Amino acid sequence: FIQKVKEPHLHELLLSFFGDKEFVKNFCQHSAAKSVHHGFIGGLLEHTLSVTKICDFFCTLYPMINRDLLLTAAMFHDIGKVNELSDFPENDYTDDGQLLGHIVMGVEMIGSHIREIPGFPPVLASELKHCILAHHGEFEYGSPKKPAIIEAAALNFADNADAKLEIMKEQLASATPGEWIGFNRLMDSNIK
């Protein structure tokens, strides 16, 4: 998906992370969560790719979306998790993960790289950071901001859809087909 991003500053920003072999190795080995969804080795990569694919699809339906901004935000939305969670087999919250969380940590990481790119447009930087800050959608879900631009809303919807469907997939994988599994507090529903 990096090659789809044509805006030169966003493209360079993506390469500053995903062109770094050590970062990519770490990113590919991390989970997306301790236990909620994609809580396995490679879960962060799988979740990120799924969210990015959903966002790319949204762009075909809603042409007013800035595709370069949304795809970049999708690829970066959980980037802070490489520092929020420790490596396997521990896969537990780090001190910074407990104190700051992946959203704040991700925005800090992105901001640090943006400062190294000459002429990075300030409005574009703010819009990208906003997408990351708002990707959980609601304050009660840990989002410091609610989505204020269409790209942030689309990212929130894609992230939520993939996380919830993965929860369902994981629950259904261990169930007898056609049988009720029982109440899932994250879905707030009985699942079949």
Where are these regions (language model features)?
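Acidic/His-rich, divalent-metal-binding segments that scaffold phosphate/diphosphate chemistry
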Residues: 1-97, 122, 138
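Divalent metal-dependent catalytic cores for phosphoryl transfer on phosphate-bearing substrates
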Residues: 57-174
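Residues that form generic nucleotide/phosphate-binding pockets
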Residues: 1-5, 13-17, 131, 157, ...
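Extended, charge-rich intrinsically disordered regulatory tails
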Residues: 165-169, 174, 178-186, 192
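Generic low-complexity, intrinsically disordered sequence content enriched
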Residues: 17, 49, 176, 190-191
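Alpha-helix initiation and N-capping motif
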Residues: 10-11, 20-24, 125, 151, ...
